[in-house]
Curated annotation (Swiss-Prot):
A lipid is attached at C29 (S-diacylglycerol cysteine). This is Putative lipoprotein LppJ. Keywords: Cell membrane, Lipoprotein, Membrane, Palmitate, Signal. The keyword Lipoprotein applies.
Amino acid sequence: MPHSTADRRLRLTRQALLAAAVAPLLAGCALVMHKPHSAGSSNPWDDSAHPLTDDQAMAQVVEPAKQIVAAADLQAVRAGFSFTSCNDQGDPPYQGTVRMAFLLQGDHDAYFQHVRAAMLSHGWIDGPPPGQYFHGITLHKNGVTANMSLALDHSYGEMILDGECRNTTDHHHDDETTNITNQLVQP
């Protein structure tokens, strides 16, 4: 009988460990929000009833990036543009995305606050739009969300600007990022 009690405890311990390992995986899947592709959607990330052309989706994030570079006087800027799917299948709708890196001057926390203050003075709203969650410093304005954090090279900051999920062109097989550094930096 003692042997069966030990076996039972071992089996229960294994089941508990398995449940503890699987629960976060299942919870992660539950957090993925389905973004329906339907006309007249009330989903704040998708208004495919009023789609943006490729040029409009690009301008939606490139213009604010230019303004941020100028307003915060960002130095050694490098930037790229791409279309990002708004779902985990890689299908439409898409949003325009700008990823830019910039040289940090002095303490990174203080410099991020300098950039944040410059953005706030140009009409950006502190924090993400309602219903969205990000790590790092996040601001939003006119359907664009900007998220700022340290780059892998800690002498640089990184900002990612995401537009609205309103581009219905299929960019599923696009695999290039367009270098837009020259568009953001004034000569």
